[in-house]
């Protein structure tokens, strides 16, 4: 892994998240070589591999028989990953696991103990958005005074995550909270540098084992021991703010995690300003740029043997909030887990 050697990445999954997001990024990284691509649908994997000019590997009956790689990207649904965790934990292969991760802290921690922290990455790439990192810095510096409260809203009537696995709880792991809303939860945790979290109240509306609406009140405890009140509204049943709002002592900041503009709205009480990002190296505005930055950070940490914000262990508080929200609705454990 040291020196100028290219990192060989194997990929499990050839669906949209891989073919439209990860492959355009990875195939444009000079220090990455795609070692192989496989999928349970061999024809689909072969077609995607041919389109990108990368090696295709037929999916073996036993995942442990997959070819060697320095890193494996698991770009498959939550419920299809269990056998791969077991197969790769003894091979010394680093792992990048697409979001969502887990429904319980226990299972999350169990995976973390099987890998070195720098060798196990999560897919919450919106941490790498320029606007998220800017707000994290503003909070740390106290530019607008202490952070008093935060809110994340996402969704509208009829807004349902795409994908053939979404209607199968054992494969998707959950509904709109778990599949998409978790991005906003993770962003709040990351920006506030939360070291603990407690869900004070949560209401979840379900249908056929899938959550369609969640509203919750959360207490985030920062590394400095400061409690920050946060609220969530994640829904495909009603309109939400579709943004993150951070309330400081002297200002309010608002932005969207999903519009790819990188814009930040500042309300100082006397004036409202729309702050457009200047063109700056390393400021990820689009989702593709954020994913590129996320991969760069992970692979850089892998080369150096040093964990960073891409480490799966760094997302444990996010999983704690997810677990508590589902527990409030009487749902416990990991759906379909062995």
Give the ranges of each region predicted by the language model:
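Short, conserved SAM-binding/catalytic segment
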Residues: 47-55, 110-115
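Rossmann-like dinucleotide-binding domain that binds NAD(P)(H)
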Residues: 162-229, 233-239, 313-316
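Short acidic low-complexity segments
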Residues: 55-68
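NAD(P)-dinucleotide binding in Rossmann-like oxidoreductases
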Residues: 208-211, 224-293, 311
């Amino acid at each position: 892994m040291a020196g100028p050697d290219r990192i060989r990445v194997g990929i499990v999954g050839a669906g949209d998240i891989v073919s439209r997001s990860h492959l355009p990024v990875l195939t444009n990284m000079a220090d990455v070589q795609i070692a192989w691509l496989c999928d349970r649908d061999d024809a689909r994997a072969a077609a995607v591999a041919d389109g990108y000019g990368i090696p295709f590997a037929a999916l073996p009956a036993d995942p442990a028989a997959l070819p060697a790689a320095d890193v494996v990207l698991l770009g498959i649904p939550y419920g299809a990953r269990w056998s791969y965790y077991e197969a790769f934990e003894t091979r010394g292969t680093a792992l990048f696991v697409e979001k969502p991760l887990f429904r319980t802290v226990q299972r999350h921690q169990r995976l973390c103990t099987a890998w070195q922290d720098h060798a196990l990455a999560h897919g919450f790439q919106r941490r790498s958005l320029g606007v998220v990192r800017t707000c994290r810095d503003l909070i740390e510096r106290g530019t607008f005074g202490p952070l008093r409260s935060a809110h994340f809203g996402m969704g509208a009537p009829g807004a349902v995550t795409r994908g053939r696995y979404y209607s199968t709880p054992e494969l998707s792991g959950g509904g709109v909270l778990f599949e998409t809303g978790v991005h906003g939860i993770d962003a709040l945790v990351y920006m506030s540098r939360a070291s603990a979290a407690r869900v004070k109240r949560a209401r979840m509306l379900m249908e056929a084992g899938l959550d369609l609406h969640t509203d919750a009140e959360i207490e985030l405890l920062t590394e400095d021991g400061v409690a920050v009140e946060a609220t969530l509204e994640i829904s495909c049943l009603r309109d939400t703010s579709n943004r993150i709002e951070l309330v400081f002592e002297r200002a309010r900041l608002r932005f969207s995690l999903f519009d790819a503009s990188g814009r930040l709205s500042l309300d100082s009480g006397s004036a409202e300003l729309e702050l457009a990002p200047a063109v700056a190296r390393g400021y990820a505005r689009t989702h593709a740029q954020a994913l590129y930055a996320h991969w760069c950070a992970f692979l850089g940490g892998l080369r150096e043997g040093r964990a960073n914000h891409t480490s799966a262990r760094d997302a444990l508080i996010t999983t704690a909030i997810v677990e508590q929200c589902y527990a409030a609705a009487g749902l416990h454990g990991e759906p379909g887990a062995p």
